[in-house]
Amino acid sequence: TALLGPEPLDLTEIEGADVLYHAEGIIRESEANAAALFGTKKTVYSAEGSSLCIRAMLYLALLHARANHKKPVIAAGRNAHKVFMTAAALLDLDIRWIYGTESVISCAITPAQLEDVIVSENPAAVYITSPDYLGNIADIKSLSTVCKKHDVLLLVDNAHGAYLHFLPEPMHPMQLGADICCDSAHKTLPVLTGGAYLHIAHGTPDMFAQRAESAMALFASTSPSYLILQSLDAMNPLLATSFPAQLKACAERLDTLKAMLRAHGYAL
């Protein structure tokens, strides 16, 4: 007797159902579809949220640092999620905090400020949270330019911005120069809780795409939820068809609402 209802869909890694972090069949095909939609070199699914993706991002940054004889130092905005700190502790990474020019919560980091930090600290990577917890979006394009100038990786916690790629203007970290980012699909897309993406950008060293799955597997459960994976897969045709238009219409309604609020004296 089904207790919740979806039990018939609650598969596990059996023959024909593929293996999430050694994907060769249906999961690999679905992830390739997602990569095409997000314009990435590689996209890997997570059934354990962006928390898992953040650990994998830092592990890949550590491998890159070792390969390039750099110290295991990450420069990070001080508003980073707690999983960033626990992952850094687990991997024995040193953190150099970057404090925002306005507040710790918004942690607005300027390109000039980032340049100073990179020159003084020589980090292996820079870690930015954007959008932040108030909805503010960092100037990823300008920060990326600074990172590329100094050959430093740019990692972005885009947990609250999976939808950004599907707006009319380029706003997603993968469109603006980030090297690796994570999206919590379950936060801003109709995906079950825990569904997330690890994205690897075009132009990054091949090692990142080659090691992405093993980096995820290092921290992940060997029993991923196939219900979550199916919801990620079901999202692909929606992203490819009606979602961008729906998102555009929603953004237009929000613009109208903001104009009304400003007209009534509210500061936004």
Task: Describe the role of every protein-language-model region.
Residues 7-52:
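Conserved N-terminal alpha-helix of the aminotransferase class I/II PLP-enzyme fold
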Residues 1-6:
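N-terminal glycine-rich, Lys/His-bearing helix-loop that initiates the first secondary-structure elements
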Residues 37, 43, 48-267:
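Conserved PLP-enzyme active-site core in the AAT-like
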